[in-house]
């Protein structure tokens, strides 16, 4: 070994690792096949209007596969005008079973069309740049109607394709019918004195209010009495207090905000020596797996969140590809699942 070889400076290990992880570029592909970068770019980008011999195209694509070439997302978006990213802006709600199913189905539907769904929960006092400014999504989706301030932010970032669009879908029609079905089911079972029990989670306050108001309106329409039994939290005696309040008001059945509240109410009623549903009936909402697993099992309202997720994904795809949007919303996706509690 010569002194020049031993004295030769070695490349730092972090630099060797960085080089090993370097992204394969179109220039690497061009060097491998001995063609110009322009020709290789035409093939890799499938540029229209270029006459490239088929055997040349195959050489380029074979080399790209062999080298592990992947187009740079930003460069591809710049060339095509699309990022193939759909951004789902989440509200500040708990990620419950229904929301997970909604996101899963929307993700599957978009993936089938070659799009990626990215979820984002913007903080009220966030210091980081909004994700829609860095990802350049083709469409921004939301589970609720966005506020005027949020819409202004999106428009300032150059985003015009936003779901839901009030001209195409009204999400309220899928949330308002659930409490009406709860009340109708209890009335059909002969109950004339109803109570409502909400959730104490502050993140759900708006949804709790909407469901309570809708249930109260349905009770008035049916000519039955309706009282508010209070909010229920997991892990304290609030469910017991709600059961006591409902009984004190003469209620024989409770409309629960969701199945978690319904399970807590049923447990509290049993501990107070009440029979369910003979002394107190309880109906939940959302039909989570737990509803069928407890005893007495929970009668609940099921929303086909999978169908709704695919429908909204279809609107997003139509906007992203400038293709016709679904003209009609899916049929009512809410049904009562009858079990033991009501």
Segments from the language model and where they lie:
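Alpha-helical recognition/docking segments in bacterial nutrient-uptake
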Residues: 1-6, 21, 81, 85-184, ...
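Short beta-strand elements in bilobed, periplasmic/extracellular small-molecule ligand-binding domains
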Residues: 110-121, 195-196, 212, 216-236
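N-terminal helix-turn-helix DNA-binding module of bacterial transcription factors
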Residues: 1-81
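Short beta-strand segments enriched in small/hydrophobic residues
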Residues: 39-42, 78-93, 193-201
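Hydrophobic alpha-helical segments within soluble ligand-binding/sensing domains
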Residues: 169-197, 214, 236-244, 301-322
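Flexible loop/turn connectors
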Residues: 240, 244-342
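An alpha-beta-alpha
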Residues: 182-224, 328-341
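Short acidic capping loops at alpha-helix termini that bridge into adjacent secondary structure
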Residues: 193, 227-229, 276-281
């Amino acid at each position: 070994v010569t002194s020049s070889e031993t004295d030769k400076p070695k490349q730092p290990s972090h630099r060797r690792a960085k080089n090993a992880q370097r992204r394969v570029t179109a220039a690497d592909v061009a060097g491998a096949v001995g063609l110009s970068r322009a020709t290789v770019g035409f093939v890799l980008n499938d540029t229209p209007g270029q006459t490239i011999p088929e055997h040349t195209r195959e050489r380029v694509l074979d080399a790209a596969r062999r080298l592990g070439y992947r187009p740079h997302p930003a460069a591809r978006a710049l060339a095509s005008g699309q990022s193939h990213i759909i951004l789902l802006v989440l509200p500040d709600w708990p990620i419950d079973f229904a929301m997970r199913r909604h996101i899963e189905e929307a993700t599957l539907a978009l993936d089938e069309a070659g799009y990626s769904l990215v979820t984002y929960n913007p903080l009220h006092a966030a210091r980081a740049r909004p994700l829609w400014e860095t990802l350049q999504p083709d469409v921004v989706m939301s589970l609720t109607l966005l506020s005027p301030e949020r819409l202004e932010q999106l428009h300032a970032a150059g985003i015009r394709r936003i779901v839901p669009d009030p001209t195409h879908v009204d999400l309220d029609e899928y949330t308002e019918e659930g409490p009406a079905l709860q009340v109708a089911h209890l009335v059909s079972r002969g109950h004339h004195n109803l109570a409502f029990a909400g959730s104490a989670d502050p993140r759900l306050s708006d949804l709790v209010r909407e469901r309570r108001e809708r249930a109260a309106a349905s009770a008035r329409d049916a000519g039955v009495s309706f009282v508010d039994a209070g909010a229920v939290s997991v892990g304290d005696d609030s469910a017991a207090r709600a059961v006591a309040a409902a009984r004190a008001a003469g209620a024989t059945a409770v409309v629960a905000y969701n199945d978690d509240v319904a399970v807590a109410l049923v447990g509290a009623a049993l501990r107070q020596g009440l029979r369910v549903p003979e002394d107190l009936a309880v109906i939940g909402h959302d039909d989570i797996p737990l509803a069928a697993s407890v005893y007495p099992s929970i009668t609940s309202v099921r929303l086909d969140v999978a169908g709704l997720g695919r429908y909204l994904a279809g609107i997003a795809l139509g906007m992203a590809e400038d293709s016709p949007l679904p003209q009609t919303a899916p049929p009512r996706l809410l049904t009562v699942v009858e079990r033991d509690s009501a």
